[in-house]
Amino acid sequence: MATNQSISIFSSASLAVEYVDSLLPENPLQEPFKNAWNYMLNNYTKFQIATWGSLIVHEALYFFFCLPGFLFQFIPYMKKYKIQKDKPETWENQWKCFKVLLFNHFCIQFPLICGTYYFTEYFSIPYDWETMPRWYIALARCFGCAVIEDTWHYFLHRLLHHKRIYKYIHKIHHEFQAPFGMEAEYAHPLETLILGTGFFIGIMLLCDHVILLWAWVTVRLIETIDVHSGYDIPLNPLHLIPFYAGSRHHDFHHMNFIGNYASTFTWWDRIFGTDAQYNAYNEKRKKAEKKTE
């Protein structure tokens, strides 16, 4: 009975979204995007698209999303939004981070990316324009991937903080007590594989078009770079997402090496009480801010 009701609610919601979508004006960028997509399909093999296309998407978007946070350090106005004001970014740390990123991206992640083509072939995932999902379907599936990844990340991240293994793997990610955007993927190669598995579980369960793979890469990069940015920007649109953790939530984890283990949402930390110290810190911070007003 409950299952039937859930299906009925889901179907009604889907119909409502489809109706709203039908009322929206035609996207002027759709035709150019369609032409570009078909040009890609006609001029490159599936292996080239899945391998080199995925690499380009990841590298271009990663450093593009890191750019605002990188520029903030040169803008005096943005300093008031920096969470750990007493720990500014240094060129030494950023250069060290960049070198490790290049190693991780091309020696660890790229070999995994090379398997994308075989993944899409094995699961018969299409590339063509005609089967590309509508925007709301892609958004819903990306949200599903985020929930799956967040769950995996919470429990495995918490395990990596166990005193018997922390110093061997996860300690590298905590070298910088005040995080910055580029540090999001600064990690031990084993951590890249362990926590990165959560990214692929969602893809294996929910991906039905290669564009969804790239969409999920985009969403995940936006999220992880944002929470590592070190800045709490008031008008950040990501704060509109229910239960979104955000930069201040994750910054506390880097500041104190404990609690707030989830990557995207707050519910697992809330359920298991691993946000208790953060909540106490946050209340104290808010009271201090009120006194200074």
Curated annotation (Swiss-Prot):
<feature type="domain" description="Fatty acid hydroxylase">
    <location>
        <begin position="145"/>
        <end position="274"/>
    </location>
</feature>
<keyword id="KW-0443">Lipid metabolism</keyword>
<dbReference type="InterPro" id="IPR006694">
    <property type="entry name" value="Fatty_acid_hydroxylase"/>
</dbReference>
<dbReference type="GO" id="GO:0005789">
    <property type="term" value="C:endoplasmic reticulum membrane"/>
</dbReference>
<feature type="transmembrane region" description="Helical">
    <location>
        <begin position="55"/>
        <end position="75"/>
    </location>
</feature>
<feature type="short sequence motif" description="Histidine box-2">
    <location>
        <begin position="170"/>
        <end position="174"/>
    </location>
</feature>
<dbReference type="GO" id="GO:0016126">
    <property type="term" value="P:sterol biosynthetic process"/>
</dbReference>
<keyword id="KW-0832">Ubl conjugation</keyword>
<keyword id="KW-0153">Cholesterol metabolism</keyword>
<comment type="pathway">
    <text>Steroid biosynthesis; cholesterol biosynthesis.</text>
</comment>
<keyword id="KW-0520">NAD</keyword>
<feature type="short sequence motif" description="Histidine box-3">
    <location>
        <begin position="249"/>
        <end position="255"/>
    </location>
</feature>
<keyword id="KW-0152">Cholesterol biosynthesis</keyword>
<keyword id="KW-1207">Sterol metabolism</keyword>
<dbReference type="GO" id="GO:0000254">
    <property type="term" value="F:C-4 methylsterol oxidase activity"/>
</dbReference>
<keyword id="KW-0756">Sterol biosynthesis</keyword>
<keyword id="KW-0408">Iron</keyword>
<keyword id="KW-0753">Steroid metabolism</keyword>
<keyword id="KW-0256">Endoplasmic reticulum</keyword>
<keyword id="KW-0560">Oxidoreductase</keyword>
<dbReference type="InterPro" id="IPR050307">
    <property type="entry name" value="Sterol_Desaturase_Related"/>
</dbReference>
<feature type="transmembrane region" description="Helical">
    <location>
        <begin position="100"/>
        <end position="120"/>
    </location>
</feature>
<keyword id="KW-0444">Lipid biosynthesis</keyword>
<dbReference type="GO" id="GO:0005506">
    <property type="term" value="F:iron ion binding"/>
</dbReference>
<comment type="pathway">
    <text>Steroid biosynthesis; zymosterol biosynthesis; zymosterol from lanosterol: step 3/6.</text>
</comment>
<dbReference type="Pfam" id="PF04116">
    <property type="entry name" value="FA_hydroxylase"/>
</dbReference>
<keyword id="KW-0472">Membrane</keyword>
<keyword id="KW-1133">Transmembrane helix</keyword>
<comment type="similarity">
    <text>Belongs to the sterol desaturase family.</text>
</comment>
<feature type="transmembrane region" description="Helical">
    <location>
        <begin position="199"/>
        <end position="219"/>
    </location>
</feature>
<keyword id="KW-0812">Transmembrane</keyword>
<keyword id="KW-0752">Steroid biosynthesis</keyword>
<feature type="short sequence motif" description="Histidine box-1">
    <location>
        <begin position="157"/>
        <end position="161"/>
    </location>
</feature>
<comment type="function">
    <text>Catalyzes the three-step monooxygenation required for the demethylation of 4,4-dimethyl and 4alpha-methylsterols, which can be subsequently metabolized to cholesterol.</text>
</comment>
<protein>
    <recommendedName>
        <fullName>Methylsterol monooxygenase 1</fullName>
        <ecNumber>1.14.18.9</ecNumber>
    </recommendedName>
</protein>
<dbReference type="GO" id="GO:0006695">
    <property type="term" value="P:cholesterol biosynthetic process"/>
</dbReference>
